[in-house]
Amino acid sequence: EQKRREDEIRSPNALPGERLGPKTAGEISQKLQSVMIEDLIREQTAVVMLPGAKGDVMFREQYVSMSDLQKRVAPNVNLFGSQWLFQFLTETVDRRLLSVLAARDLSNLADSISLNLNISTVLGREFQYFHQKVGEGTNKVIIELQMVDIFADMAAYKNARDLLQNNG
């Protein structure tokens, strides 16, 4: 038990606070439905570097800063305290991120954007709405999926993959 706690403390994903539990996850999920997250969305640029050339932007990943989100909704709870409960919370974060991005004008993106989403999000109505709002810019949106999510439900992954491929 002591070794497990020490490993958690050393984890690069560890956040301060008590371990996330089911009751707390439910309460946080409710808060996430209405908390402002627009100012918590960050951008990370992926650049390809070729020998003898300057770097070219591949895409700009859009994500919600989890440490800032923790400070806003649950400053005394380590959101990474339980892998599966964190996964549950990210589904709500995904929906909120899509809602914020859908409200922006994404029709004239200079660079591609990347979103790391849960498979359940890709299969949900919020993603369908986002896809409609992006319109002709769908070729500029890259969707990343987590391997753990893929292997947890291969049938859902295949449905999501087919949906994404069929919709551009």
PLM ranges: what are they?
Residues 8-136:
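Bacterial c-di-GMP phosphodiesterase EAL domain
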Residues 4-6:
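Flexible, Lys/Arg-rich cytosolic regulatory linkers and terminal tails that connect or flank
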Residues 133-168:
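The catalytic core of metal-dependent phosphodiesterases that act on cyclic dinucleotides
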